[in-house]
């Protein structure tokens, strides 16, 4: 009887490291961002919310590069399975994912992409143009498509399994992040409304 272990070598350390790095990154940036929001520790260390945000951006970007390298290495160590070797589809998914990620970064800028709102660096208005008119979370879903695209391009079931882990973690991250971010902006609007009322009463 065929089992998943026939297509995925769970004994490979590289597979375990890939899973750990995939799990670590969103947990790390959410924990650090919330700590910054509550205590402003990065702002105090670097003397400015912008410098603190740039430091976090470089850290998150570097961790992402490391995660991608570990993922690529993990796939090299995994069995090849011909039915999931779909290089054309994999390349197309990777291209679409890259467009979503890069256009999102362009639309949001550094501080918008890398949790600037937790530093008090808020955007004047939500971005509603491309790619946000396609999906509300283009960075996350674009990245997920990149993982899947690489897995299909290389014909590795392990890559599909790790992509599922990416999807689950990003889904939970959004459930955690979206309400918190919405409250940050709602708080700003309440403060603006209060300030306007105070100005009228003077």
Curated annotation (Swiss-Prot):
Membrane topology category: Multi-pass membrane protein
GO cellular component, one term: mitochondrial membrane
Family: Belongs to the class VI-like SAM-binding methyltransferase superfamily. PEMT/PEM2 methyltransferase family.
Catalysed reactions, semicolon-separated: a 1,2-diacyl-sn-glycero-3-phospho-N-methylethanolamine + S-adenosyl-L-methionine = a 1,2-diacyl-sn-glycero-3-phospho-N,N-dimethylethanolamine + S-adenosyl-L-homocysteine + H(+); a 1,2-diacyl-sn-glycero-3-phospho-N,N-dimethylethanolamine + S-adenosyl-L-methionine = a 1,2-diacyl-sn-glycero-3-phosphocholine + S-adenosyl-L-homocysteine + H(+)
Species per Swiss-Prot/TrEMBL record: Emericella nidulans (strain FGSC A4 / ATCC 38163 / CBS 112.46 / NRRL 194 / M139) (Aspergillus nidulans)
One function term, GO molecular function aspect: phosphatidyl-N-methylethanolamine N-methyltransferase activity
Protein name: Phosphatidyl-N-methylethanolamine N-methyltransferase
InterPro entries for this protein: PEMT/MFAP, Phopholipid_MeTrfase
Intramembrane segments: 13-33
Transferase among keywords: yes
Binding-site positions, S-adenosyl-L-methionine: 95-97, 177-178
Keywords: Endoplasmic reticulum, Lipid biosynthesis, Lipid metabolism, Membrane, Methyltransferase, Mitochondrion, Phospholipid biosynthesis, Phospholipid metabolism, S-adenosyl-L-methionine, Transferase, Transmembrane, Transmembrane helix
Domain of life (superkingdom): Eukaryota
């Amino acid at each position: 009887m065929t089992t998943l272990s026939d297509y995925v070598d769970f004994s490979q350390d590289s597979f375990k490291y890939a899973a750990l790095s995939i799990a670590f990154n969103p947990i790390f940036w959410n924990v650090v961002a919330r700590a910054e929001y509550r205590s402003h520790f990065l702002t105090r260390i670097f003397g400015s919310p912008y410098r603190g945000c740039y430091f976090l951006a470089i850290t998150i970007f570097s961790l992402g590069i490391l995660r991608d390298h570990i993922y690529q290495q993990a796939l090299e160590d995994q069995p090849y399975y011909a039915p999931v070797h779909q290089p054309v589809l994999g390349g197309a998914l990777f291209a679409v994912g890259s467009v979503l990620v890069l256009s999102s970064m362009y639309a949001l800028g550094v501080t918008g992409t890398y949790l600037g709102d937790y530093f008090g660096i808020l955007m004047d208005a939500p971005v509603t143009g491309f790619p946000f008119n396609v999906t509300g979370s283009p960075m996350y879903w674009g990245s997920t498509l990149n993982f899947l695209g690489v897995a299909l391009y290389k014909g590795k079931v392990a890559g599909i399994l790790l992509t599922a882990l990416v999807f689950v973690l990003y889904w939970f991250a959004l459930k955690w992040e979206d309400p918190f971010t919405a409250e940050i902006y709602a708080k700003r609007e309440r403060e603006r409304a209060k300030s306007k009322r105070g100005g009228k009463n003077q």
